[in-house]
């Protein structure tokens, strides 16, 4: 059985399925994908996302606000914990830091990230981490906020082995995407080859 550990089912293109989500899900499940984790990127669309996947027990959800989502409702830890009480919820995120797409004073990203970690610790659920060009600050905040207690995954990892090894030491898993197949991704493939199989997604 295949498990898709990170998807956004509420944002998938349905052109090939005549805009029929049920047809898309039928085809996906028939292809051998047995379970999916539908990952939240903001709170405004979370109720709609949750309702969309409700008929499908093969889909779990997470709750969180992506670091690139600006002008969004800022999540308070208590609110995230309340939403995470849903039996179908298995994680907090996606959250983290992104210095590639965001500019200026990013203190708000740091605060948002800390709120997610606090929520994860409060409800005992793992974190889904998005990090891009923010290695030192991501690791520092994970340590400062005690993220080791809950662990989680660094999703769509594109950083170096030094960051991967430190994340592994903090109890996290490392997830790679199709980027590792790109011709110029030799360094990333070398990182993937060093991640223990039981910590690799």
What annotation goes with each model-predicted range?
Residues 1-201:
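Mid-domain alpha/beta scaffold segments of enzyme catalytic cores
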């Amino acid at each position: 059985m295949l498990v898709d550990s990170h998807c956004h089912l509420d944002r998938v293109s349905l052109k090939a399925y005549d805009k029929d989500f049920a047809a898309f899900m039928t085809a996906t499940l028939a292809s051998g994908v047995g379970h999916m984790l539908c990952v939240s990127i903001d709170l405004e669309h979370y109720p709609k996302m949750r309702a969309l996947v409700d008929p499908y027990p093969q889909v779990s959800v997470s709750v969180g606000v992506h670091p690139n989502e600006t002008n969004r409702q800022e999540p308070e830890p208590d609110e995230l914990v309340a939403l995470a009480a849903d039996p179908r919820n298995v994680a907090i995120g996606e959250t983290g830091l992104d210095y590639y797409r965001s500019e200026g004073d990013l203190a708000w990203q740091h605060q948002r990230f800390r709120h997610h970690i606090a929520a994860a610790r409060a409800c005992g659920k793992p974190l889904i981490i998005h990090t891009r060009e923010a290695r030192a600050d991501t690791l520092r905040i994970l340590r400062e906020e005690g993220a080791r207690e809950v662990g989680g995954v660094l999703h769509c990892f594109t950083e170096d082995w030094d960051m991967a090894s430190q994340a592994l030491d903090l109890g996290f898993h490392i997830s790679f995407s199709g980027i590792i197949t790109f011709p110029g991704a030799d360094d990333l493939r070398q990182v993937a080859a060093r991640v223990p199989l039981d910590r690799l997604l």
